Amino acid sequence: MNTPFLIIADDLSGAADCAVGFALAGLDSTVLLGCDVSPGLQATVLTVDTDSRRDAAEVAAGKARAALDRHGAGRAVIKKIDSTLRGGWVAEVAALQPALGMALVAAAFPELGRVMRDGLLYVHGQRLADTATWQLEHAGREDRPAVQLRQAGLRCEVLPSTLLDGDAAAVQQAVARAITLAWTQGCQALVFDVEQTHHLRQLARATHALTGIFWVGSGGLSRELAAALPAAGARAAASVPTAGPDIAPAWSSTGTAESPGHTVLTVAGSLSPMTRQQIACMATDTRTRVHTIAAAELRQAPGADLSLIHI
């Protein structure tokens, strides 16, 4: 039986990113836009967008706890956070910890150039506190995750990335010992140094079956947790159609304007510069049609239900 998950995210793009990772691993995933929305069908992976990225810390914490209270029964929990530590994630973790146990924190996302070394987050080699974004939004504020958690009242330690090096069995034992020791010493949160994607993968594989813990991390950790679930690879492979020797797959690029084959609908709702670049790149293909739709038009559409997305 698949482990049911609750993912609590503070914005929609992060919520969708995590949900898609589990969907690609073969698990049915639903995204709820708000804590009070009913999921309808009971999905294996339930992701709640609390829309709290810009809320005050106490408001964000209240939304996270409300999501847990309403949807968390019987589910392993991931608190999705931004890989550059935006939002009220510290208050959210502090609100969730008493109910869930040890927080395993891995904010790094090496594929995007965000790594954790000696308890410090680096963005493309630059310490987070020195980046233009941090200077603009958080100048003078603490950027070390462990220190932030301690300031919120949680007892926290940092574990080195070397703990995640080695063969999987040895890493699993080492991580389990570290968590047990930290817990017996009264620790409530562990921040993991992560410098490479394989560190995230090792952490996910070593902890996916543990109880009395919850994960705090970016989309990178969520993706590795999805892949670490038993038979996830087999489920994902089984869900991808294969072509016979004389049959082109549905997504074949051999289609023409006269015989286009399947049409792909891409919906982009992010304001990030990277998303804009991706849209511009797609628009250079003569087969692509780009339509810009104002959010107000979607909200006013007759019969529109914007509270639930099933993936």
Question: Model-derived features: where do they sit?
Answer:
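N-terminal basic/disordered segments at the start of proteins
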Residues: 3-41
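Short polar catalytic/cofactor-binding loops
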Residues: 11-13, 52-53, 271-272
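Cap/lid and interdomain-hinge subdomains that line or gate substrate/regulatory clefts
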Residues: 2-5, 29-32, 44, 55-77, ...
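Conserved, well-structured core segments that form the ligand-binding/active-site neighborhood
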Residues: 122-305
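Short gly/pro/ser/thr-enriched loop/turn and capping motifs at secondary-structure boundaries
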Residues: 37-39, 110-114, 221-224
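Short glycine/serine/threonine-rich phosphate/pyrophosphate-binding segments
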Residues: 14-17, 88-89, 200, 275-276
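Conserved small/polar residues in nucleotide/adenosyl-binding loops
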Residues: 309-311
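A structural-propensity feature for long, helix-poor, extended segments
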Residues: 45-51
